[in-house]
C-alpha cells in the first residue's frame, strides 16, 4: 500500500513538472489572437458592405443603362447581408465556406461594376464617385491586410492544435480543433479587385 501511494505521488510530481509544457495557455493565447484577427476581417468586410449602397446610387445616376450590373452588385450585397457573421463562422468550416463564397461573389460583382464605370467619363469625373472609389480602394487594401493577419494567426493556432504535446491538451482538455482559413485556390477572393479610375 505504501509503495502504491509513493508511486502515485511520484507520478503526480512528474505530471506537475510537465504540466507547464502542455500548451494550455499557449492555445488560449493563440485562440484569442485568431478571434481578434477575425474581428478585424469582419470589420473591413462590413466597411465595404456599407460603402456599396452609396456607390451604386452614384453609378445609377449616370449609368442608367447598366441595370443588370447594378442588380448583380445589389444581389451579391444582399447575400452577404443575409449571412450570420460572428465568431461562430471561424468554428464551422461550412459557414466559413459560405462566408468566403458570398464575399467572393461580391468582389466579382464590384469588379464588373468598375468595368462598366470605365464607359462613363462623366461619372469618373464626379467628385462623390472619386471619393467613394478612393474609400473602396482603401477598404480593399485593408481587407487584404486583415485576411493575411487572420491567415497567419490561424496557421500558428493550427500548429499548436496539431503538434505534440499541445495536441493532447487541445483534444482532451480543451476539445478544440483546427480552424478554417481562406482557401488560396479561390482567386476571386484571394486577390482584391483592381479599381483604377484616371
Question: Where on the chain are the PLM-derived regions?
Answer:
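A helix-centric hydrophobic-segment signal that preferentially recognizes long
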Residues: 2-198
Amino acid at each position: 500500500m505504501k509503495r502504491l501511494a509513493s508511486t502515485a505521488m511520484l507520478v503526480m510530481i512528474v505530471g506537475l513538472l510537465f504540466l507547464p509544457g502542455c500548451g494550455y495557455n499557449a492555445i488560449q493565447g493563440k485562440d484569442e489572437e485568431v478571434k481578434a484577427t477575425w474581428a478585424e476581417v469582419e470589420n473591413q468586410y462590413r466597411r465595404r458592405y456599407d460603402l456599396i449602397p452609396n456607390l451604386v446610387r452614384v453609378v445609377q445616376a449616370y449609368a442608367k443603362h447598366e441595370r443588370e450590373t447594378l442588380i448583380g452588385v445589389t444581389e451579391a450585397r444582399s447575400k452577404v447581408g443575409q449571412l450570420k457573421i460572428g465568431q461562430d463562422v471561424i468554428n464551422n468550416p461550412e459557414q466559413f465556406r459560405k462566408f468566403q463564397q458570398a464575399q467572393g461573389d461580391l468582389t466579382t460583382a464590384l469588379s464588373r461594376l468598375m468595368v462598366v464605370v470605365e464607359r462613363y467619363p462623366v461619372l469618373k469625373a464626379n467628385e462623390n464617385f472619386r471619393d467613394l472609389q478612393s474609400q473602396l480602394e482603401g477598404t480593399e487594401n485593408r481587407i487584404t491586410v486583415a485576411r493575411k493577419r487572420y491567415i497567419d494567426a490561424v496557421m500558428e493556432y493550427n500548429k499548436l492544435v496539431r503538434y505534440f504535446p499541445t495536441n493532447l491538451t487541445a483534444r482532451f482538455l480543451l476539445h478544440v480543433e483546427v480552424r478554417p482559413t481562406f482557401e488560396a485556390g479561390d482567386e476571386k477572393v484571394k486577390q482584391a479587385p483592381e479599381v483604377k479610375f484616371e
